[in-house]
Amino acid sequence: MKRRFTLLLSLAFIFAASFAGNVDENTARRVATAFLHSRMPDAHMVAPELPEALPAIHIGSERTLMYAFNFEKGGYVLVSATDAAIPVLGYSFDGIFTFDNQPPALSAWLTGYELQLSDIMDRNLAATPEISASWKSLTDYQPGETAQRDLRSVEPLLPSTWDQGSRYNALCPVDGAGPGGHVYAGCVATAMSQVIYYWRYPLQGTGSHGYYSDYGYLFVDFSQAGYDYDQMRNAIGPESNYEMAEIQYHCGVAVDMMYAPDGSGAYSFDAASALREHFGYSNQLSLQQKDNYSQTGWADLLMQNLDNGWPLYYNGFGSGGHAFNVDGYQGTDYFHFNWGWSGSYNGYFYLNNLNPGGNNFTYGQGAIVNFYPGSNYPYYCNGVKTLGRHNGTIEDGSGPVENYTAGLNCGWLIAPSDSVTNLTLTFEKFNLTDGLDVLNVYDGPDASYPLLASLTGTALPQAIKATGDRLFLEFLTEGDAGSGFRLSYNSDLAVFCSGTTIYSDFSGVISDGSGTRDYNNNSVCKFRVEPENANSITFTFNYLDTEPDYDQVKIYNLASQSLVASFSGNEIPESVTVPSGKAMVLFNTNNDITAGGWELSYVSEATTVGVAAAVNSGGLGVQVYPVPASDWLRVELSSRLPADVLVSLVDLSGRVVVNNIRAGFTGQETVLIPVSDLAEGIYYLKYAAENSVGTHKVLISR
C-alpha cells in the first residue's frame, strides 16, 4: 500500500505539471505572504504570524503577467500570474512597489520578466516538477516553518543608497533640462562609485583621461585627485556634497560617459578597464558575460564573489546598457540588487529563466567580478584627521573585509566648518577585541575634554551625542583580531535665516545671518522693510558673495508688487532705491553650492508728521543747514509744546555716528553737530519725537 500511495502521488504531480494554468489573485496573495515570511531575516521578524498584504497591483499591458503585493509594515513581493513559471520573481523587506519613479534598470528587468511570462503563457508550457513543488510548498506554508530561513545567504554588502540625479551630478556638465540643472551622472558611474565607496579606495587616482563629449572636451587628471571618503555619506541628503559628486563625475569621464539630460550612458567594458587603469583595482578584475556560463556556474561565480565580501557591478537585460549593483543573495536563485536610485526598489530578484523550457530572455547580463582593491590595500589609519563637513562616515581603516592591525594610535576630529547642533555618532558596524582594543569618544576637540564613551567588544553601541559642535575619536589597538568599526556622524545645520522678519526702523542692516560661515542650501528668507511714514528706501550692499545666478537676493517694491532688482555673485552693485515706504528683500538658495553670504544697509526717507500740520497744534519743525556741510551741521528745532527729541546722524551702512538729545524744550532749539572728523559723503539726519519722525539727506563735502 505504501508503494501504491507513492505512485499515485507521483502521477498526481505529473498531472498537475501538465496542465499548468493562470494564478488568481487570492492564490498569489497566499504565495506572497508565505514567501516573504519564509525569507524574512530575524531582524525583520516582528511577529510569528504571516504579514498582511495590501491589494494587488496587476502588471501587464494586455493581461496580468504578474502581481505586486505591498505589505502594511513594509516590503513587497512580485508573484507570477502563471503556475508554469517559478512563483516569486522578486521581493524586498523594505519599501513599496509602485509604477512611479522606477529606476530605468528595474523597468528593463521587469520587461524581461514580462517577455518570459508572455512566452510561457502563449506556448502553454508545463511547469517542471521543481516549479510545481515550489508553488505547493508556498500555498501549504505554515508560519512555524523555518527551513527556508536557514538558506545560504549574504546580507547586502553596500551601505550606500546613491543615485545618479540631483546633487550626485553636481560636477557633471550643466544642462537646464537635467536634474538640478546638470546631466545625469549615469548608471555606469553610479554602479562603479558605490563599490568604490564601499572599499573607500583609492585615496588617489592614477593617470589622466579626456574625451570630446556633446558638452565639449572633458578631462580629469586622476593622479591629482584625492578622494575623501570620510566626508562622503551613505546617502547625500538635501545638501550638496562635493566629494560624492566628484567620484561620480570622475567615473563618468573615465568611461567616456555619453552625457544627456534625460539619461547618460556608457559601456561596461570601459568600466572594467577604467577601474584597473585609473582607480587601481585588482588586475584580476574583469567583465564576465552570463551567456558564457551555465545557470549553476553563473550563480556560483556571483556567490563566490559575495562570500568574499566583494560586491558586483552588474548589467542587465538586453542592449539598454543598464547598470546596477549585486551585493547579496538568499539561496542560489535570488540576488540582492541595489539599483542606484536612492534606495528605491532595492531587493532580491530572480536571475534565470522563469521556466527552463522557455525561450532565453536573460541575454545581455554581465558582471564585473573580482572587484576588489590593489595590493596596497588596506591603508589602515594613522595620525589625526580633521573632518570639516557637518556629516559623513568614518571607518577604522581596515576596510570591510580585513581585520585591523595591532599598535594603532589614530584619531578623527569632527569639527564642522558650519554652525551645527545635535552632533551625533551612529554606529553601523562594531567589532573590537573586548578589553584589548578601544575606541574613545571625547566631548570636544581633543582628549583633554570629557570622555563620553570608551567602547570595546562586539555589541553595537548606542548613538553618542556631543554637547557642543566638536567630537574627538581616538582608536587604540593592542590586538589584531577584530574587524573594526564603521559609523556615521550627523548634525543639524544652524538656522541662519528663515520665514519673514519685519524691520520698522528708519535705517538698519540686513544679512543672511551666516556671519563668518557659509549660508545654507534650500533657504527661503524674507525681510519686510516698512518704516513708519517712509516714502522711499535706499539699499546699499556692504558685501555680496552668493552662487551666481542660482542663489539670489531680490528686492521688491511691495506698494506696486514689482521686482526692483535681483543680485547674485560677488561684485558689489550700485545702491538701489525703492520709491515707496514698503519693500521686501527675498533670499532664495538652491540645493547645490553655498558661499559667504551677504549684508546690506538700508536708509529711508520720510516726511514730518505731527498731531496737526500747523506748528501751533503741536507739530515739530525741523530745518537743516548748511547743505553741503563741511565742519558743522546746524539743526533748528521748533515746537509749541514741550518735546523730547532724539537727533541722530547715520552713515550709509546704517551706523549711527552722532546721537544728540534735546529734552523738554519749547519754542526754538538749535543743535550743532560737528562733522569735521567725518568722511565726505552722504549721511542721513534722523529725528524722532513723540508725534513726529523723519529724515533729511545730508551731504558732507570739503
Where are the model-predicted features located?
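C-terminal outer-membrane/trafficking sorting elements
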Residues: 16, 614-625, 629-702
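Cys-His-centered catalytic/binding microenvironment captured across papain-like cysteine peptidases
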Residues: 23-54, 59-61, 77, 84-163, ...
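Active-site-adjacent substructure of cysteine-protease-like catalytic cores
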Residues: 53-73, 273, 277-338
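Residue-level detector of functionally pivotal "anchor" positions at catalytic/ligand-binding pockets or at interdomain
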Residues: 364-386, 493-502, 506, 510, ...
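Short, surface-exposed beta-strand/strand-loop-strand elements in extracellular ectodomains
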Residues: 431-450, 543-563
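Short beta-strand-plus-loop segments that form exposed binding edges in beta-rich domains
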Residues: 473-481, 585-594
